[in-house]
């Protein structure tokens, strides 16, 4: 399917303005000026955001400049939130003393996060379930509108279905039946000469989780790094 047609279909299927945030990349590679204007829309109405970033070797060695770019672009599209947080896919916090807290949204804090991210190379099993569960269990709040942004390139877990069922259960508010947080994801390309199975698994998993939890999955390719 044509990339532009696929993006348009996703745009009409999601809440107005969400794809303006998720993630500028799918807009910047399109030359259509009308599409570019979508990037100027306000993002969704979340007042707190959490980045869950795969810090595995494949990401750090192959995709890290793109990761830095996309984190900055996402932050820039939120002029002001009440707080944000960063952890890796295993639920390890960028700043361990901040577990259970929100980092204040200030220019200085944003700069600190980006600078720390440049060298943030932790061991990772390339499975976002731990980070997603940690984020939901620790931060869900009925008075807050929270969006998760999962960045990754592979899913190495044995099966997708148990992960989807676990997240569906954890992310459901018992009182209202609604979702506690919105889950969005960005899939990064792996080397063309590497096995593609785990990358396909990540895309399948995150597309399903995003569909179930009010968000959007966007898959990048090498052109998006430019």
Name every feature range the model reports, one short phrase each.
Residues 57, 72-83, 118-122, 136-144, ...:
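Sec-exported extracytoplasmic/periplasmic mature domains
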Residues 15-22, 29-50, 56-63, 104-105:
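Acidic, polar low-complexity linker/tail segments
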Residues 62, 66-73, 108, 112-116, ...:
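Extracytoplasmic/secreted proteins, especially bacterial periplasmic and envelope-associated proteins
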Residues 42-101, 104-145, 147-151, 157-158, 187-200, ...:
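Von Willebrand factor
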Residues 37-43, 178, 224-226:
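Pro/Ala/Gly-rich low-complexity, hydrophilic intrinsically disordered segments
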Residues 3-21:
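Bacterial N-terminal signal peptides that target proteins for export
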Residues 119-120, 154-212, 218-220:
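VWA/integrin I-like adhesion module and closely mimicked acidic/polar interface patches used
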């Amino acid at each position: 399917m044509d990339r532009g047609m696929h993006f348009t279909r996703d745009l009409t299927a999601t809440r107005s303005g969400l794809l303006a945030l998720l993630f500028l990349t799918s807009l910047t590679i399109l030359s259509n000026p009308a599409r570019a204007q979508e990037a100027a829309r306000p993002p969704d109405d979340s007042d707190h955001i959490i980045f869950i970033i795969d810090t595995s070797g494949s990401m750090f060695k192959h995709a890290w400049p793109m990761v830095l770019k996309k984190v900055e672009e996402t932050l820039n599209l939120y002029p002001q939130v009440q707080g944000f947080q960063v952890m890796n896919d295993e639920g390890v916090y960028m700043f361990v003393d901040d577990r259970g807290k929100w980092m204040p949204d200030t220019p200085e804090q944003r700069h600190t996060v980006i600078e720390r991210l440049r060298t943030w190379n932790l061991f990772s099993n390339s499975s976002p379930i731990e980070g997603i569960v940690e984020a939901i269990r620790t931060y869900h709040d009925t008075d807050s509108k929270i969006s998760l942004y999962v960045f990754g390139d592979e899913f190495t877990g044995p099966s997708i279905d148990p992960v989807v069922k676990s997240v569906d259960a954890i992310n459901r508010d018992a009182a209202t039946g609604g979702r506690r947080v919105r889950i969005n994801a960005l899939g990064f390309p792996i080397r063309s000469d590497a096995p593609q199975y785990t990358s396909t698994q990540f895309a399948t998993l995150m597309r399903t989780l995003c569909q179930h939890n009010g968000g959007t999955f966007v898959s990048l390719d090498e052109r998006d790094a430019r």
